[in-house]
């Protein structure tokens, strides 16, 4: 599962994966001869969406529509209902999830970025006191930087590990908000992890998933952020678990998104809850809104969709929302320690 030599190449990905918007993408689209294209963009690229739409329309010669619903990740590609007349989709900013089937021909454009100078980035890490036995995790946009950056760290005396995750991850070292198995694969060989990318979303998720300090480095600004306080994150979630141990009526949340549907897990949790004397109700949704859970005669919820709903947005809901492992803690089937991240495989 680890790599002592550069092995950050992809698994056998299909030809509809492209690093950037450019001639190769346009050529593939023209060859597909679509009648209409739908484009999905993440929040960070919305400002550029209209220019991109015009460019694709001009290059390919067919109508293009933009999906305006918020995009929550690679698991959340446009459904048939969102653009029923589009026979091809373009998804920007994400790699495909290998074990999730798409509903129409879909072209994933990962929006790769070169990032900063590897030597300068390594110097920043060394100056920041990051431990020398280090695991690297990266957002898909900065995958091309991993190898030169890893070599620059090695020249400064770092022992660097890159892990290969499970079947949900397309690349070694890759991070998904629901899956950090690339880090878990090498956790026993490192003293800390460094996330290479922007924002706190992945560092926080990684801190939940591994019992190691998690630092983060913005490769665009060459800015090193201190280690996440994992203890505080875990204590906060344990407090939520403690407050619902006496709850007798539970809602079990199930997503209809193709990449988030864990109906078998929901039904299994329902059986285990009933065996422990709890009442349960399964609730199905596509995009979950806190208002959807208002006024219901339920004491708490367990969410089988994206684990980040509970971990990042739980405070916005009218009743506590737990991940499946937290739910099993609450009904007495699992101990509070060690904390278990809800990895979506």
Give the label of every model feature segment.
Residues 2-4:
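Pyridoxal 5′-phosphate
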Residues 8-24, 29-210, 214-226, 230-238:
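The feature marks the mature, well-folded catalytic cores of soluble enzymes
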Residues 41-52, 64, 258-266, 270, ...:
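Cofactor-cradling patches in redox/metallo enzymes
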Residues 68, 164, 284-286, 323-325:
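Short loop/edge segments at beta-strand edges and connector loops
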Residues 94-97, 198-201, 257-258, 306-309, ...:
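Short glycine-rich anion-binding loops that position phosphate/pyrophosphate groups of nucleotides
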Residues 149-150, 201-280, 287-295:
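Redox- and metal-dependent alpha/beta enzyme cores, enriched for Fe-S-associated oxidoreductases
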Residues 220-224, 229-231, 307-345:
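Peripheral docking tails and interdomain loops at the edges
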